[in-house]
Amino acid sequence: ALSSAASDVYKRQLLYYMKKTLLLCYIAILYGFSGCSPKQPEKDYTWLKQGIETAALQLKFTVAEIGDSIRLPRSIWTGYDTDFLCRQLDKKQLTGKDSARLKPIHDNLGSRRYCFSIYDWTSGFFPGNLWLAYQLTGDESLRESAVKFTNYLYPLREYKGTHDIGFMMNCSYGNANRLSPADSVRSALIQTADNLCGRFNPEIGCIRSWNFGKWNFPVIIDNMMNLDLLFYATRLTGDDKYKELALTHARTTMKNHFRDDYSSYHVVSYNNDGTVEKKCTHQGKSDASSWARGQAWGLYGYTSCYRESKDVQFLRQAENIASLIMRRVKTEDAVPLWDYDAPDTPQTPRDASAAAITASALIELSTLVEDGQAYMEYAGKLLKSLSSDGYLAKPGTNRGFVLMHSTGSLPNGSEIDTPLNYADYYYLEALLRYMQVKEIDYKHI
């Protein structure tokens, strides 16, 4: 039997542990933890779940519809009229050459899925969408489809006709190598990176963009996106030549593409001695305007350059572009008009693709700075807008594309207020990055 003193000590210890247990239980209830249950999100992420589930359903719908076709979905064929384009471009009339292109009359305008061969610059995005959706959901059928459509692109490892082989192969084979690595996938990426390096001119310090047009050596701001393939090739091989070439291109582009306010020209063409031939646009409102997707390409590219090099000049460039974008947006939901200098009217098309690219870039940028909360919050606003009924398609509609209301190339009368496969890609990538930063498990939403 316990002595009276020992009994008192025992009672006090028992009371202490009972109080401690009750306190721990209260804290567990207060913060939503349970020893038998997985961690649950503290906020309402219904919009996030809806975006992921819609994307998975739309991609499965598209896979079923296109079957074994090797032509990959890019957009929906839409109509337009030249008067509308003139108003958007502040022109009294379009040139004869433009007018000849601006006549896509078709019985199925607005509903016909627009598919292209593997040599189209967007060919890597549909397989990439499948890979990202698989990573987000763990759905094995999406992985199987991703493998199938990625394999279609295997001949591109030998293609040298465009800088866009970075888009085409990194978004497809790059994701494949992350999620289902194989020696053949790795070698295809390295071969493609070598071909991209073959477009680099050391006198100019840039990778050539297009092989068409009257320009001498065109470089477009979009080209900043192809540098990720070269960074990846350095990681795969241990050879810094790919990375150093990419950073040289980025420095030259920083010097010549950007204005004092950190807005970017779309196209800079160089003379053979490295001097600038001309600065202009091919997809923006005017040579002097700020084409929305072009600004997003620049933000994304310089964020990647800082991530890989830790060179502070690239961080400053990315932050200044981010500041420009957040300052100049005219819309309440932050999804930009197709050009930041476009007419501010209800009729002016938005560009959901620019919003998705910006969101993805800002999420990564938020992880590279000391206090990235403002970037993360702005990216969250963009993603919530894109995940709303105003932009996220209903399952079974929109010909299987995930997002609505993107603009491809308005001055060329191409893909205006329509879905685009690369809008879907960067939307899914942004959702994935958002979940990784917030440590959200899709299964527990």
Placement of each model-derived feature along the sequence:
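Intrinsic disorder/low-complexity segments
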Residues: 1, 31-34, 403
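Glycan-recognition and catalytic cores of secretory/periplasmic carbohydrate-active enzymes
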Residues: 39-445
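Positively charged n-region of N-terminal signal peptides that target proteins for export
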Residues: 11, 18-21
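Sec-dependent N-terminal signal peptides
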Residues: 21-30
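Bacterial Sec-dependent signal peptides at the C-terminal "C-region" and cleavage site
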Residues: 29-42
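Single conserved hydrophobic/aromatic residue that forms the stacking wall/gate
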Residues: 1-13
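Short, low-complexity interaction segments enriched in Ser/Thr/Pro/Gly
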Residues: 8, 16-17, 36
